[in-house]
Amino acid sequence: MCSPTPTESHESLNKNTHCGNRMQLTSEKLPKNPFYASGSQYANKHQKFFQWRKEKPDHYSHANLVDKALKLLKERIKTGDALAYFLRGQLYFEEGWYEEALEQFEEIAEKDHQATYQLGVMYYDGLGTATNAEKGVDYMKKVLDSPCPRARHLKCAAAYNLGRAYYEGEGVKRSEEEAERLWLFAADNGNPKASVKAQSILGLYYSTKEPKELEKAFFWHSEACGNGNLESQGALGLMYFYGQGIHQNTEAALHCLREAAEHGNVYAQGILVEYYYKMKFFTKCVAFSRRIADYEVHDIPRIAQVTDCLPEFINRGMAMVSFYHARCLQLGLGITKDEAKAKHYYSKACHLNPALADKLHSLLIRQRI
């Protein structure tokens, strides 16, 4: 069975997606470290807290847990527990109380590398303070350059974030070369304990830079995919489909795309919907498109947070699905014909991604769909 011929809708490997909307460093979660524990782990170590949960299950609500954790941390701070200072700031941060978190982190930044890292995130993203990319970059550099063993687990995440800053020219002079160097450091030869996002972004970088280096792109997407990155798993599917950086292999492509789609990669779902439509597997096409055709723009941030996929690719996937779902409804392919619903989903595709919808419509006019 032949794979579909490439269309203009597949720009993910041919268009630089990082020069548009400014990325947020909060998308890179604070790395875990054996030197530290989370607020919940810290609280659970105390028998008093455990017993309270057991005896009063009616109080086991989020608000009550937060209040209890803050009281417990306050007690530990009084005893001189240095870790409790950071955990209180982190709890503020996770609850969205950014001004309180900023104040707490600034108080302990000279003694706590995780607080320094979080200050870098907050100043860069403008959380609890005015956006100050330069200051955010300075804090990240402090983490990256620190010789202290307690900063070691933060270095890959800091390097990844600094790479993004250099790539986007935010807080520093734009430099793709420096971004690449930092991402390679952060990716650490595919180490699963390093920054998997750096591994994935290298795959995207090498497939969009000029000249393209598709073999490198395939390598890094493979590393990231092996470490659980859904974005790269979908990208590998496309690379196998079109023989980019690897020999064309439709079976491997479909395997990657189905796995990625099953775990929530919306763009992979969109590619599969298009594939099933072109191969005239209309029942399958509709079965897949039904799953996400009713997603809305406001769902994108939540999906991005859950799947760790880039919002722009989620947007494209949703637009593709809406377009092909509309086409099936318009013609009664694999579903009862309904022109009113078809019009709704065509409009939705245009609203989600006007450029992509226009290109798909152009292909339709030229009878390539």
Please place each PLM-identified region on the residue numbering.
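TPR/TPR-like (Sel1-like) alpha-helical repeat modules
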Residues: 141-143, 186-187, 261, 277-298, ...
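TPR/TPR-like alpha-solenoid helical repeat scaffolds
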Residues: 153-161, 194-202, 274-277, 302-325, ...
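Short helix-capping/linker turns of helical repeat alpha-solenoids
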Residues: 79-82, 110-116, 125-127, 132, ...
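Hydrophobic face of amphipathic alpha-helices that form TPR/SEL1-like repeat modules
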Residues: 90-94, 116, 121-125, 143, ...
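Intrinsically disordered, low-complexity regulatory regions that flank or link repeat-based scaffolds
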Residues: 1-64, 72, 76, 350-354, ...
